[in-house]
């Protein structure tokens, strides 16, 4: 009697599996994203269990010798910074970004700069296209071997022959195996091929890089299980111009706080050397209405950022917040605190918030500067150019301390910001002609700033 294979349906967006077809995925919320995928029959499951029943032994953790991660420089200091000091041997690194952002350019520059043996596997471009890009970038390619293949078995066969230090796959969505089904780019194909390649580097002192497509929401396409399988997930973002940002979303061997900043030009990606003042403009006198500055921490770096706000009367009974660089929930919360604790009404206004330079801000230390920008926009009164603001705003209107305050102050002073507003409890020797203003509440800060501005 033939074995009965159970039916299963999986979401093409996130990999969620359900025994029945669903119109909307309960995990990621996508509509009409379920496709039927074959699942193992009960006989197959028993066969797998039997095959994997070899004896294993447990051992005490205290008997294991600790090992430091062995890192290899990728040849690009800014990329090494994001990884935590270089790529770790036997690790898998996934880079996600929208089409045309520069993923292939970055990996080709890494392949040329690392000084190690590299196998570059391309499933999207022809050899002539890749050579043309290398010539445009004017990079050395003597250590790079190229393989244009999409079957994972072919890739593994070449890997076993060459044993390169760096393995680059562009992209993982184009690799397939007949063992995982007849249709490429399915959930099963992604999981199977990623697992095969990761298993290969885990057994050797190599490093695996592969690119991944992103969805229209900016999330990495494919099942989340692939992100769990790799050691590092790096997001490749851009602003409206030629600036690129590299940010680690997951890093088993380092911090996820570091930010890499590049500019895209004729010669490819170039690291920004002076990041402290990269996102602000030199001005004299007053800032434009609705602008305020804050020193922001990203990993070991501190740089000044200008927050811009605009308020207009709402055109309907439902007000809206437009902010894609700062979480809109944070903007709404700060506006609500101003309305409650200061008495300035925002509930009848549409709010627009932007960050100059296009960088995304996540830390709470931007709250006070955001509040100053919102108040300035609502009152149509500018803030002094040489003033900067540091602090988190609580729901009670208090200004709370933030981490690495001394480093933030040093950066702000170095860029000519002579008056810094900080939370209560800060002890710092302020060199002349700089002024450190200690404030306890948002209402106190607003009263001091804007009473002087009006005067």
Curated annotation (Swiss-Prot):
<protein>
    <recommendedName>
        <fullName>DNA repair protein RadA</fullName>
        <ecNumber>3.6.4.-</ecNumber>
    </recommendedName>
</protein>
<dbReference type="InterPro" id="IPR041166">
    <property type="entry name" value="Rubredoxin_2"/>
</dbReference>
<keyword id="KW-0234">DNA repair</keyword>
<dbReference type="InterPro" id="IPR014721">
    <property type="entry name" value="Ribsml_uS5_D2-typ_fold_subgr"/>
</dbReference>
<dbReference type="Pfam" id="PF06745">
    <property type="entry name" value="ATPase"/>
</dbReference>
<keyword id="KW-0862">Zinc</keyword>
<feature type="zinc finger region" description="C4-type">
    <location>
        <begin position="11"/>
        <end position="28"/>
    </location>
</feature>
<keyword id="KW-0238">DNA-binding</keyword>
<keyword id="KW-0479">Metal-binding</keyword>
<dbReference type="GO" id="GO:0005524">
    <property type="term" value="F:ATP binding"/>
</dbReference>
<dbReference type="InterPro" id="IPR003593">
    <property type="entry name" value="AAA+_ATPase"/>
</dbReference>
<dbReference type="GO" id="GO:0016887">
    <property type="term" value="F:ATP hydrolysis activity"/>
</dbReference>
<dbReference type="GO" id="GO:0003684">
    <property type="term" value="F:damaged DNA binding"/>
</dbReference>
<keyword id="KW-0227">DNA damage</keyword>
<feature type="region of interest" description="Lon-protease-like">
    <location>
        <begin position="350"/>
        <end position="455"/>
    </location>
</feature>
<dbReference type="InterPro" id="IPR020588">
    <property type="entry name" value="RecA_ATP-bd"/>
</dbReference>
<dbReference type="InterPro" id="IPR004504">
    <property type="entry name" value="DNA_repair_RadA"/>
</dbReference>
<dbReference type="GO" id="GO:0008270">
    <property type="term" value="F:zinc ion binding"/>
</dbReference>
<keyword id="KW-0346">Stress response</keyword>
<dbReference type="InterPro" id="IPR027417">
    <property type="entry name" value="P-loop_NTPase"/>
</dbReference>
<dbReference type="GO" id="GO:0005829">
    <property type="term" value="C:cytosol"/>
</dbReference>
<comment type="function">
    <text>DNA-dependent ATPase involved in processing of recombination intermediates, plays a role in repairing DNA breaks. Stimulates the branch migration of RecA-mediated strand transfer reactions, allowing the 3' invading strand to extend heteroduplex DNA faster. Binds ssDNA in the presence of ADP but not other nucleotides, has ATPase activity that is stimulated by ssDNA and various branched DNA structures, but inhibited by SSB. Does not have RecA's homology-searching function.</text>
</comment>
<dbReference type="InterPro" id="IPR020568">
    <property type="entry name" value="Ribosomal_Su5_D2-typ_SF"/>
</dbReference>
<comment type="similarity">
    <text>Belongs to the RecA family. RadA subfamily.</text>
</comment>
<dbReference type="Pfam" id="PF13541">
    <property type="entry name" value="ChlI"/>
</dbReference>
<feature type="short sequence motif" description="RadA KNRFG motif">
    <location>
        <begin position="250"/>
        <end position="254"/>
    </location>
</feature>
<keyword id="KW-0067">ATP-binding</keyword>
<keyword id="KW-0547">Nucleotide-binding</keyword>
<dbReference type="InterPro" id="IPR014774">
    <property type="entry name" value="KaiC-like_dom"/>
</dbReference>
<keyword id="KW-0863">Zinc-finger</keyword>
<dbReference type="Pfam" id="PF18073">
    <property type="entry name" value="Zn_ribbon_LapB"/>
</dbReference>
<dbReference type="GO" id="GO:0140664">
    <property type="term" value="F:ATP-dependent DNA damage sensor activity"/>
</dbReference>
<feature type="binding site">
    <location>
        <begin position="97"/>
        <end position="104"/>
    </location>
    <ligand>
        <name>ATP</name>
    </ligand>
</feature>
<keyword id="KW-0378">Hydrolase</keyword>
<dbReference type="GO" id="GO:0000725">
    <property type="term" value="P:recombinational repair"/>
</dbReference>
């Amino acid at each position: 009697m033939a074995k009965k294979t159970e039916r299963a349906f999986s979401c093409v967006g996130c990999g969620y599996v359900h025994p029945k077809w669903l119109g909307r995925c309960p995990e990621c919320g996508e509509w009409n994203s379920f496709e039927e995928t074959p699942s193992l029959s009960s006989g197959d499951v028993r066969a797998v269990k039997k095959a994997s029943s070899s004896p294993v032994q447990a051992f005490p953790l205290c008997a294991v010798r600790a090992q430091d991660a062995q890192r290899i420089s990728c040849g690009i200091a800014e990329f090494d910074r994001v990884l935590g000091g270089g790529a770790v041997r036997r690790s898998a690194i996934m880079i996600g970004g929208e089409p045309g952002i520069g993923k292939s350019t970055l990996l080709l520059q890494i392949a040329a700069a690392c000084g190690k043996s590299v196998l570059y596997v391309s499933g999207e471009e022809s050899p002539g296209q890749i050579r043309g890009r290398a010539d445009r970038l004017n990079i050395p390619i003597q250590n790079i071997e190229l393989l244009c293949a999409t079957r994972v078995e072919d890739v593994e066969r070449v890997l076993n022959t060459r044993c390169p230090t760096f393995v680059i796959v562009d992209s993982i969505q184009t690799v397939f195996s007949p063992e995982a089904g007849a249709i490429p780019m399915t959930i099963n194909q992604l999981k199977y091929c990623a697992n095969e390649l990761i298993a290969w580097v885990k057994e050797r002192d190599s490093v695996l890089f592969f690119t991944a497509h992103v969805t229209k929401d900016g999330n990495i396409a494919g099942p989340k299980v692939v992100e769990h399988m790799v050691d590092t997930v790096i997001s490749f973002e851009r602003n409206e111009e030629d600036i690129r940002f590299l940010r680690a979303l997951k890093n088993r061997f380092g911090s996820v706080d570091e930010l890499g900043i590049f500019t895209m030009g004729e010669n490819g990606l170039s690291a920004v050397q002076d990041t402290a003042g990269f996102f602000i403009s030199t001005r004299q006198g007053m800032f434009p209405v609705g602008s305020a500055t804050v020193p922001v921490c990203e990993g070991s770096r501190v740089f000044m950022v200008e927050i811009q706000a605009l308020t207009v009367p709402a055109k309907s009974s439902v007000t809206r917040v437009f902010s894609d660089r700062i979480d809109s929930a944070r903007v709404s919360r700060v506006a609500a605190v101003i309305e409650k604790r200061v008495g300035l009404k925002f509930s009848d206004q549409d709010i627009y918030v932007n960050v100059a330079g296009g960088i995304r801000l996540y830390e709470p230390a931007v709250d006070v500067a955001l509040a100053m920008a919102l108040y300035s926009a609502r009152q149509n009164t500018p803030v002094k150019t040489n003033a900067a603001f540091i602090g988190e705003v609580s729901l009670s209107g208090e200004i709370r301390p933030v981490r690495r305050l001394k480093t933030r102050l040093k950066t702000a002073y170095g860029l000519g910001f002579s008056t810094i507003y900080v939370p209560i409890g800060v002890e710092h020797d302020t060199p002349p002609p700089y002024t450190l203003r200690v404030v306890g509440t948002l209402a106190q800060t607003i009263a001091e700033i804007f009473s002087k501005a009006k005067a």
